[in-house]
Structures are given as structure tokens and as C-alpha cells.
């Protein structure tokens, strides 16, 4: 795809005139952004049609990726880059005295995701397009996304993330392809002349309207489609409205459209639980209907479905897609149960993202039965047949059968639907995949060991390196050529230069410039001043007890007390950078945010530690902010309790940008340390077997507190608090239950932080470690992950 500068300039000027009635010279930054986005979207749409035509012409297998969220970030920069149009666009705008970065800043982050699950899904759309694997993602078009985070006096406050006005330009609605989704009511089964019939009564309909976004591959003709379903009422109730029942008419419409309002509504109450289940069925059912219609249009039969499609369920949220496909095959296509189930088994695969059995999703059976009456009937029959199959495999072991069953304790266990049905069940790191086999799904591993796979997560590395870190990209081009842009494994060529003094100096210079750039951005955006010569120590991820941001905070408090007592001690200045949202109903996570923010304020206002210690809390952390931070980062905090993080992908982005991992051997940290060398990371904490052994003996945090003067002093300090505020909820939790063993790892974490300071002073050693990480980050490319899925799970081959 090539445009000359003149051709692209004409495209932009024509679009500005037709859409906004302005010339390029007179256009606002927002108008230029919208028109550039429209041009880019149209180019991707045209390319996707050509690509899809080739896919169908060759009869290739297609992949459908169902996920509750896709954390897309901004689209313009990456789309132009992947299409090879970024330089010509930049040049055209420069002639009009417009900086392209100003245009990029007009775009809001798409409010379609929250954390690692959604970012992984977004990276995989990029990977599929680049690798030429025909892929479509399915999710919901959330009107308000997750939420915008404001920190007010230390407390997180949530406001609506009204992203659609700026983001709508990337989305094309297709109301002609809408699906009707039915909830509630009764499903009445009858048998007539040996044939099974199901009749629905008193149901409520919601219309699912598809809206499409596109993700272009880099250096390939591939384009992935992301189809997002928007909930609409079937029609406005004019009779109620005309009769004066305005509230009735409006509430019916509002109730339907509530489904696509926000991601992960608070489920601390029954209404929230019902809404979440409705969301899951809404998007799963609409997606299955869409997939089957497309297949029938192409092939005229569903008998070859398993040869032509693969459906990946990313976590358990879309599990109801399985009984929904069974419903269509049984009720609408007259398949026998065994034939229908065989199709589902061959089509569906499941990615698990959980390491704790108790965290697996379950639905109250009464809510499930009332909300999805026909799906409930099918799930009951699945449970009956599942129990019968398990009884043959484990005769007499009723406890095992009850544990593995789909329904139990008045709950529908979605993970067991997946484990029983899917032909492949994969974890997302080597450690996680072993944990799945050893504990989470141990019994299912005994039942069907061939189904269990590992696909270590990967990232869209071009976004996080080529687009976000041009300084490092340029250094790599000069040192190892540009092969790494299409093949991440080429980064390995850098390894022979890790002790080259010229390369070390150049890499250090790039890092210092990136830190200065981030410091300048932060000052302009928030007024906060940070020292670019201090260590940038970063922990950015969802706020959660298992991710142990409070362990980090405890160490900062210990360093603060140490500096107060030892004002002349040698101490390398440190800036601790946090970015995290807490789930709205997660009180302890909000307390952790308050503690970190208040500790930061105390440190800021104390002249005794000025210039030595700093905490920065990045409000409303998101993908675009991450793209600024990663190139500037030096320390990557990955400090979850061993055996609790499935994989992580932030750790990979930090590694790629030359940060040193300070972490436990958990999730993908294990593979990062294996790839770069354990001596090039700073590892601390218990190993997973040690954690399990300590739990088995009975963990008592006080055993680790009482003999540690620093631990006692820090907990007392935070418990008493300052300026009339204390953090006794957090400290009481740590003293009494400490579910994620913060206190057991605290002493070794402090040792690791001390080692970090020593290493940082040895610039040659630090630069060696940093370059080792960059040169071994290639294995964590989404391109590699997608080819693993295609080969080992989907049976899909590239379309070039």
C-alpha cells in the first residue's frame, strides 16, 4: 500500500472539505484527527474485504476470538504505522505546520477494556493480522467503558468514561446484520411424532447491533475485524407512550440498552450479577449467530463447521457460547445431541487466566434459570451427561464427580463447562499451565490430559517499541539492522553488543532522554515534578491484594523512616511510579490506593527526604499513558505472590524497553528470567512450592513480623498514621490474615530493593542487564503466541 505525499495530501484535503467544510490550513486538530481516522479506517475496511475474499476463496479456517473486553488504546498512530503511512502523514501535516503528535493526542483511549485480559486480546488481533491468520474478535460496544479515575484526597472516585464521541470515528455500524437475543420467560419442551420442539413464552428481546473496528497487520495484507455488539430495545413502546405511561415506555428501552452501558458493572448485589450474566449471554449469543450465519452463507451446511472455524474463549465470560451453539444446532438445525456436542467439542477452545480454584466464575443457579431458561435446560442435560461420562472414568469416586460436574451447590460452574467440552484448555505461561494441571483443573487433566496446552502470552511489540520508543528503535536499527521490525527473534542479535561500551552509552543516553520526556509530560499534564536522574521504579497494573502494591508501599515507608533516622546515609534517589484502578466495589484495593497517595503526600511535604524519595500516582492509568511510561522505566515491579499471577504482559513491555524485573518467580517472570538470565533480573520471595507448604502448615503473619524490627516499625507507623489519618484497615489485614503473604516476603523484598540500589550505582553492570533484557524479549511477541495457537490449538494456516 503506497501513497505519494501528493496523493495522501489530496485524500486528507478532500476529506476535510467533504466532512468539515474546511481547508487543511484552517482545520482544527480535532477535525484533522477525525478525517485522518476516517481515511485510515476506510483503507483498512477496503483491505479487509480483499483479504476476506481471499480467505473464503481459499476455503481457509477462520478464528473467532470471544472476550469480554478488548483494551485497544488509541488506534491512529498504530494503524498508520502498520499500514506504512505514518511518515507520509507526518510529512503532509508538517507542511501545514501541524505536529502529528498533536493530532494523536486528540484521540481518546477506546473504553472497551480494563486490564491485562483486554490488552492481551487487543495484541492478539494485531498478531493475527500480521501473521495472516484470518481472525475476528467479538465483544460489546461499551458506551462508557470501565470508568475514568479521579483521585480526591487519596480516594479513588469513578466518573463516566464518555469515550464514544471521540472514538466513534473508528466504528462502522451494520444495523442490517443485527441479531435478536431473548432473555427471561419460559422455554417449554414438547415431543411430537418423535421430534423435539421448544417453544418460548413471555420472553424479553434485546437487539444486538454489530459495530466494526479494524486492526491492520504490520507488513502484511492481513486485517483483523473487531465486531462489537450494541444493545438496543426491539422497538419503542408507542402504545404505552401514547397512553401516558411514559416511564413504562422509557424504562423498557433503558433496560435493554443498559447491557452495553459499562464494562464489569459492580456485582456486589443481585441486580449487578443479573446484568453481568445478561451481558455475557448477549454478546456470546449474538456472536454465535453471526458466526453460524456467515458459515451457512458460504458453505450451506454446518456439517463442516469444525473444519472451517475455531472459536477461542478468552476466560470464562463467553462460556455461554457453548450451550448457545448447542441450542441452535438442536432446536433450529435438528441435530442429534451427540452430533451437536461433537461439533462444539471440536470448535471450542478455552484460555484460562486463573490460578486459584476459588476465583473461577460460578453463577447462582436460580439467576441462571430465570434469566436464560432454555440455556439452563441445555446446561442441565450437559451436567447429566458429564456426570455419566465421569462415572465411567472414575467409578465410585462420587466426590471427584461432584467436584468436576457442571452444576453443584446450586451453582453453574462455567469453567467446568469449558473443561468438559473444549478440545483444548491452555494456560498463559509455563508455570501457570503447570498449576492448571496440578491444582485448578487437576481432575480434568487426569480425565483428558491431551487437551491441556501452554501458550505463553505475547505483546504487540511494535506498539511498545517501534511506536513508543523511537530512540531505542533507531539505536537497534544502527546496531543490528531492521529485521527485528518484522521478526522479533532478531532482537537476539543485540546480545553480542551488551558489553560494547559505545552501545551501552547510546542505550543509557536514550533512556535518560526518555525519562526527561516523561518528566516533562508529567509536569505539563499534572504539575508534578520528578527528577529524571532518580531511579524510575514502576508498578502499573490493576490494584489488587494479590499484585501486592501494599508490599511496595511498606518498603517505601521503611525507606522513608530509614532516611529520617539516617539523613547522611548513601541513598540513590528513587521515584516510585504507581498506576492502577481498583474495582468500584473493592474496598481494600481503594484503601491501598489511599495509603499510597497519602504516603506520597507526606514524603513530598517533608524537607528531610526531598530529592531522595518520591511517589507519583498516575491518575486514570491507560494504554496511551503506558506508551509514554514504558520507554522511561528502569525497574519493573512484578511482585505478586508466587503462584497467583497467571502470566502478566506488562512485565514483557518493561523488559522490551530495557527495564530490569524486580519480581517473584511467578507467571511469565519465570520465563523472562530464563530468557535473559536470572542474574539479569532481581528475584526475591518464596517459590510456589514454598508458598503451598507454608499454607499447608498454617500461615501466621505474626511469625514474620515479631522478629523483624523494620516490619514492626513500618506497621506501627502506618497504623498510627499522621495528620489525623491512619491505615489500620490495611495493617490489621496484614497482621491477622495477610492472604497474599506480604509479611512472609517483606524481608527478602527489602533485600532485593537494597541490591537494586547497589546494581544501579554500577552503570556498566546495569546497562549490561538492561541490554540483556532487550535482546531476549523477542520470544514474548504476540506474533509468536498467535502462531503457537494456530499450530497447536486452532489448526489454522496463514493467508498471505
Question: What residue spans do the PLM features occupy?
Answer:
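A conserved ligand/cofactor-binding region detector
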Residues: 1-800
